[in-house]
Amino acid sequence: MEKTETSPEMRLFGPGGERLYLTALERQRFLAALDEEHPMDRLYCHVLHYSGCRPSEALELVPRRVLFEEQALVFRSLKKRKTDARGRTKQPQYRTVPVPNILIENLDLVYGIRALQKKQKGLDIPLWTMSRPTAYRLVKRVMDRAGIVGKQATGKGLRHGFGVAMVTAKKPLPLHVLAQMMGHTDTKTTEIYLQVVGEEKRQMVSDAWEG
């Protein structure tokens, strides 16, 4: 009998039931633990936190994809099929993700993005030159400092925590909007964020009672 494999991206819990996403409190602690990091490293972690992007997608971010008027970042969506059903090469897919204005302003403060865009120079040079392993160690270091221990203490845990936060907010983000923001092809993938437990689920039930 053929064994069915499940993509890690599709799970909020490990094989033993361990949580793979950050709770609201853990997300707050992660942000608070960033104070000791270099401004550039701090911004990398802020991008992960506020956009829900994949760590490797953040590493590809370039000045051209920082949108000031829209207060958004543009990411190339990874984990997409590179060929269509007929084997033809597909064009890269991008998505726009709204982020807090303070993040846009801090990116400009550290990298001088407005000036680069005005001069039309260096627009396609990645903001971060660190490797994926270095980025992984950065996130792990901040998690350790924040006292976050477990399989959720990763960049993917941050991404899942973002998804959970969006569906457990007082005004939950519609799944089709969240799917676009996270680069999901199908909203069925995004529905995993409804499988929340603990305080997040209690908050959803409480909101439903109040409604």
Predicted regions and their residues:
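Catalytic-site neighborhood detector that most strongly recognizes the C-terminal catalytic loop/helix
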Residues: K79-R81, M182-D207
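Conserved tyrosine-mediated DNA breakage-rejoining catalytic core shared by Y-recombinases
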Residues: E60-L109
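Basic, Lys/Arg- and aromatic-enriched nucleic-acid-binding interface segment
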Residues: L20, A24-P55
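Active-site/catalytic core of tyrosine-dependent DNA strand-transfer enzymes
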Residues: R27, P100-G150
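DNA breakage-rejoining catalytic core of tyrosine-based enzymes
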Residues: K3-Q28, T83-I102
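A short, glycine-centered helix-capping/turn motif at helix boundaries
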Residues: E37, V47-E60, A169-L173, H184
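Short, basic, alpha-helical segments at the C-terminal edge of helix-turn-helix-like DNA-binding modules
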Residues: R159, S206-G211
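Short, basic (Lys/Arg/His-rich) helix/loop patches that form interaction surfaces
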Residues: L34-E37, K118-L123, R137-Q180
